[in-house]
């Protein structure tokens, strides 16, 4: 019931840990760009130590322990039967079969199209430092000030996405957070390029990141799986991963062609020109053509729930 909210809370708290980066920029690095490696070395060491601490002292969840105990109490014959059924289900899967199935059914087909648009905007998540330094011509001190507000915006919008998902459903979350990402990225570009204030610039790009990945986690990690039958669920979710890589690669190729042509001062507008159409396309497709999946029983999902009645009837007749 509150899985998305709890996940968002944990993620938001973790994001606030990145406040260490601007703090180290202002102290150890002292806003001298040649010392950047010192900034990232310390968080890496701290992260390693904390991970080791968690590995040694974190306890298993009650859900896992209950499931494990239930499995150990199951007779060996029944375990073997379950394993056999699992292998038979996996044998029905495969990426090629999943792709064919996805394009054949309305929900998954439009999810793929929406993801193609959505991931075209992914360059915005990796190029904000370039925009601030090269296009907005912000000083190292201004970038440090912006980075103090970046985790705050990121954590806040990550938290919002979790509460929206549990309260209003997957589709509303994706549309709302995509709109939020679009607004925040526009604000980031204009705040940086027109020298409004580094604090607003940092908060805006943080809001974009939190909104973008809040929508991305929902569309890729949840809706694909909730729109697929059990025997194809794992294979269908791989499609999302492939789309992320393909569209991200395509966006990178486009920028590699454009970067030598346009001046550095225009980089921000170039990334804006790729981010806005991608997010707008994803919003329109999700709103008009994709159905809600919240509350579905994953054991009974067939993938045909969103097809037109005539098509479903034809498939049932073919199956008979």
Which residues does each predicted region cover?
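Cytoplasmic membrane-interface "Motif A"-like loop-to-helix N-cap segments
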Residues: 167-178
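Juxtamembrane intracellular "pre-TM" segments in multi-pass secondary transporters
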Residues: 70-109, 309
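Symmetry-related core transmembrane helices of the 12-TM Major Facilitator Superfamily/SLC fold
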Residues: 37-56, 269-287
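Glycine-rich segments within core transmembrane alpha-helices of 12-TM secondary carriers
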Residues: 4-30, 46-47, 240-252
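C-terminal ends and interior cores of transmembrane alpha-helices
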Residues: 179-195
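Intracellular juxtamembrane helix-capping segments at the cytosolic ends
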Residues: 1, 215-228
């Amino acid at each position: 019931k509150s899985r998305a909210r709890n996940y968002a809370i944990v993620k938001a708290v973790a994001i606030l840990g990145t406040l260490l980066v601007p703090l180290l920029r202002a102290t150890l690095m002292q806003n001298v760009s040649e010392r950047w490696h010192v900034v990232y070395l310390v968080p890496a060491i701290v992260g390693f130590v904390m991970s080791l601490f968690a590995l040694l002292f974190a306890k298993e969840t009650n859900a896992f322990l209950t499931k494990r105990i239930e499995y150990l109490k199951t007779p060996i014959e029944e375990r073997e039967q379950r394993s056999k059924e699992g292998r038979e289900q996996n044998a029905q899967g495969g990426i090629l079969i999943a792709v064919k199935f996805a394009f054949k059914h309305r929900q998954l087909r439009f999810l793929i199209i929406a993801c193609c648009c959505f991931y075209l905007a992914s360059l915005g998540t990796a190029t904000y430092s370039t925009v601030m330094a090269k296009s907005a011509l912000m000083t190292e001190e201004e970038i440090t000030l912006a980075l103090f507000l970046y985790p705050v915006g990121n954590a806040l919008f990550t938290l919002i996405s979790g509460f929206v998902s549990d309260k209003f459903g997957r589709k509303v979350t994706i549309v709302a957070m995509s709109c939020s990402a679009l607004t925040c990225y526009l604000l980031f570009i204009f705040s940086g390029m027109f020298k409004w204030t580094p604090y607003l610039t940092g908060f805006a790009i943080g809001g974009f990141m939190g909104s973008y990945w809040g929508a991305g986690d929902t569309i890729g990690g949840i809706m694909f799986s909730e729109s697929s039958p059990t025997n194809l669920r794992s294979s269908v979710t791989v499609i999302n991963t492939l789309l992320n890589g393909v569209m991200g690669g395509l966006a990178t190729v486009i920028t590699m062609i454009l970067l030598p042509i346009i001046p550095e001062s225009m980089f921000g507008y170039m990334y804006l020109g790729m981010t806005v159409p991608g997010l707008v396309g994803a919003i329109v497709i999700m709103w008009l053509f994709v159905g809600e999946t919240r509350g579905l029983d994953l054991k009974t999902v067939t993938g045909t729930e969103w097809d037109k009645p005539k098509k479903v009837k034809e498939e049932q007749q073919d199956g008979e």
